[in-house]
């Protein structure tokens, strides 16, 4: 397991989700307007610190990014570095020209304002100061470790959530290199073990139908 796993290995693309009518219908059906794009946009803005493209270094034909500055808000102090790379892939550069020739222009607002139609130079999770990848580990975890008393247990996997008689989570049974022990919780247990392990962990902890185990 790698700390910052997905953001450490993915393609570094940083886009918002689409602002569509389907989101509004979903919000209306469940009676919760917090699912709409305008409600979620501030959270996207809160996480990121945007740096405009360096056009001097990106001085390549068809490589000028179009974006909507209002999609970003650096006053919120987001730790995740978001910018445009200084190097441009020649194949993508050619694709940009091909889209224009086919009458498919680049989106004037990019892919950070809720519209994902057409083409766009996409923002990336790259720190422009040193051109390194900005991950959940480098942008969030390192600051948290320095500012709090957080302890990271590496090479450790949760095997069961523990509950008291009142069905309140009190800790987690974990395994480190075959050694089983318990980590106790003072306030709460946050389940964030991935799309597969999170439900599996809940099931083995008795929080689902026995038939699913």
Locate each region found by the language model.
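Structural core of flavin- and non-heme-iron oxidoreductases
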Residues: 1-213
């Amino acid at each position: 397991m790698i700390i910052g796993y997905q953001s450490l290995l993915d393609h570094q693309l940083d886009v918002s989700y689409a602002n569509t009518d389907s989101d509004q219908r979903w919000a209306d059906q469940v009676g919760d307007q917090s699912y709409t794009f305008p409600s979620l946009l501030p959270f996207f803005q809160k996480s990121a610190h945007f740096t405009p493209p360096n056009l001097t270094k990106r001085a390549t034909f068809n490589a000028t990014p179009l974006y909507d500055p209002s999609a970003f808000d650096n006053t919120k102090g987001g730790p995740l570095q978001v910018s445009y790379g200084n190097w441009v892939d020649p194949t993508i550069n050619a694709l940009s020209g091909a889209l224009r020739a086919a009458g498919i222009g680049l989106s004037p607002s990019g892919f950070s304002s809720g519209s994902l139609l057409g083409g766009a130079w996409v923002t990336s999770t790259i720190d422009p100061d040193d051109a390194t990848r900005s991950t959940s580990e480098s942008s969030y975890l390192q600051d948290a470790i320095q500012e709090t008393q957080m302890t990271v247990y590496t090479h450790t996997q949760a095997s069961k959530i523990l509950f008291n008689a009142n069905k309140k989570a009190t800790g987690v049974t974990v395994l480190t290199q075959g050694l089983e022990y318990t980590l106790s919780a003072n306030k709460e247990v946050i389940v964030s073990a991935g799309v597969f392990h999170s439900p599996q962990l809940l099931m083995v902890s008795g929080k689902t139908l026995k038939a699913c185990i």
